[in-house]
């Protein structure tokens, strides 16, 4: 009996000397849980970072459009002292940068949305895993995440996951100050993912305290199922942790083994993924964030740099260049003006062609009877000859007055001297001895006496268009 007591005393002494990990092996080791929480926080920060970065870049691109719109050729130019040594070079650079970056706005916004969404989804998967284990605490002191001592992990020890007690409602949101602070920096998601495999793996489960193990990580009949063992592999967080049904005593003293996240968990072991960066939800986040970073880097600070150069050249370093609607549309207005002038020119040409066709009939050399039968002709008794009736002729389209000069000029034909006598010194020329202008269909290549009102109507039309454009500018 005394001998038995001595044996019992020795056994108790040995048990009390075992390290906390062995004696209180209730589940997930603190270092592993902390690595998972850090990954989750950084994924949320990455989502915020992508959204903020895209917003900033798009704002800069639109601002570049704004300031460049004011950089018109006749604007006040900077000098070398203003940091603008070559105005034209800055103008061209700003134009090219604006065109290239504006074309990327839609793609940038789409890429940022995908990256942020994937990072947020991956963080959610890890949060669900940690939340389930953190809440698993029994009345007799059992738990699924061990703290730094012999008790369960606290929210302070899991600060990258929780802001209060270990409840899902207290997990860090994307708007949490901790996430915002992390979003101001940069991180390598692949490195953080691999850290989940390395942290707290080798000594997480060992010893012979299986009866105290976390049931959420055991596949035997006294584990995650009631009264029966699993029929296959159970996976947490898309394979971050896996365990199977074999082994009557649950977790063996051989500890945790590391296999690919897709491997089947056989035997007594609990398998941590040796390749967390390849877990589908994490791999997707890493890939889409990388895609966004590549696109964002192609834009970089180009728009911002161009803005500063433009402001210097516009002598606006210390003031905001306001958006002027007319300047934003200078090119458009020029095109529309040219189009309007072309259309007006065509219309005038058609009118002149009709006028030529409707010019007064030739009444010369007609006898009295024939003259009376010819429309537009009448017999002049005093002179005894056939002449055009008074009031015939086409109206001037610009002034609305009758153009009685057409026949007056054309009757002289190639007689230059007679043509020029029709003009009164000091007054606008009535006739001109010249070749035909654009739109004149009557022998345009031949020099002869022609009506001067053709140019008058076109000059009036151009003056109307010019006045309208100047009204827009001022």
Curated annotation (Swiss-Prot):
Compartment annotation: Cell membrane
Residues bearing a lipid moiety (GPI-anchor amidated asparagine): 451
Gene Ontology cellular-component terms listed: plasma membrane; side of membrane
InterPro entries linked: Trypano_VSG_A_N_dom (IPR001812), Variant_surf_glycoprt_trypan_C (IPR019609)
Keywords tagged on the record: Cell membrane, Disulfide bond, Glycoprotein, GPI-anchor, Lipoprotein, Membrane, Signal, Trypanosomiasis
GO biological process, one term: symbiont-mediated evasion of host immune response
Region Disordered: start-end pairs: 388-449
Propeptide residues according to the Swiss-Prot or TrEMBL record: 452-474
Topology in the lipid bilayer: Lipid-anchor; GPI-anchor
Domain of life, per lineage: Eukaryota
Segment forming the signal sequence: 1-22
Biased composition (Basic and acidic residues): 414-423, 435-449
Sugar-bearing residue positions: 74, 95, 329
Disulfide bonds: 37-161, 144-214
The UniProt record lists the keyword Glycoprotein: yes
General function of this protein: VSG forms a coat on the surface of the parasite. The trypanosome evades the immune response of the host by expressing a series of antigenically distinct VSGs from an estimated 1000 VSG genes.
Protein name: Variant surface glycoprotein MITAT 1.5
Native organism: Trypanosoma brucei brucei
